[in-house]
C-alpha cells in the first residue's frame, strides 16, 4: 500500500492514479491463481485486460505488441521494432521494452537479441532465463538454462 501526502494538488493525484491504473486492480485472486499456474508451466495466457494510460505513444505501441508474442516463442528487438513500425529506432524500442511496468503478464521476457543472447531484463537475466525455461520446458535441452 502506498500513502501520498499531497496538499492542494489535484493534478498530482490524477497523475498518480494514471501511473497506477494498469496494475491497480490487476492482482485479484483470479490473476494470482493464473500467475501461480504460469510459474508451474500450466498457464499460457492471462485473462486480464490491460489499458496503459501512462507512457509515450511508442511505449504503448511496443507494450501492445509484446502482448501478441505467443507463449514459448521469442522475438528479436529488431523484429519487434519492425512490427511496431519503428524499424529505425531499435534502441528506443528496446528502452520501451525495459520500461514495461507489468512483467510476465506483458511478456517482455520473450524479447531477445538478434544473435540469440538474452539481452537485458529489468528483473535480472536469471529471471528472464527462468521464465523462458518455464515456457519451453517441453524441449529436451533449453538454450536458456545457462543464462547466456
Model-predicted segments: where are they?
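Low-complexity, small/basic-enriched stretches
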Residues: 1-47, 114-122, 126-148
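Short Lys/Arg-enriched helix C-cap and helix-to-coil transition segments
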Residues: 104-111
